[in-house]
């Protein structure tokens, strides 16, 4: 569709049994799509020390024109060509 819709799959690890995905804030600056992923954890909680994977998919909230972009998720870069 036009403009193209961009979905970003984000995979990572959570440090313990109490930590959960919180949000993904995004901003587009020129040809760079910056996404900051944060987690949330209850204060002073007793948690299992099990590291667990998480995965989420977000839609880029911008009308992108055809071209080359850099997607930057918590300082990890990936190239995108539309």
UniProtKB/Swiss-Prot annotation:
One of the GO biological process terms: DNA restriction-modification system
What does the UniProt keyword field contain?
Answer: Restriction system
Judging by the UniProt lineage, the source's domain of life is Bacteria
The role this protein plays is: Could be a silencing control element for the regulation of the restriction system.
Q: What is this protein called?
A: Uncharacterized 10.2 kDa protein in HgiBIM 5'region
